């Protein structure tokens, strides 16, 4: 990684390096997660690994950092943990993640659903 080691870094991938628990999607995860994991562990400044591919939101600790998977902007995958369940779409809202660094170098992530929703309403 050519980035300076004294600043936090984000690594972006399409395929997650970790299992999601959804067998049909895990069959298509990153091919060499251990090789990437060794690089991630070598650097102490990897704040987050950001991915897509799962078509649903997921967060998991891995190799000293957090893997954050964004929802899809097209369709979401049905959450099925049983083996031999074929992948299926579900009509959950599409969405995206918005990541930003605050003034204290903390990475803050919001998940935003895309669609037409009532509101905003006063909140007390």
Q: Model regions: which residues?
A:
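Binuclear metal-dependent phosphoesterase catalytic core
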Residues: 39, 61-124
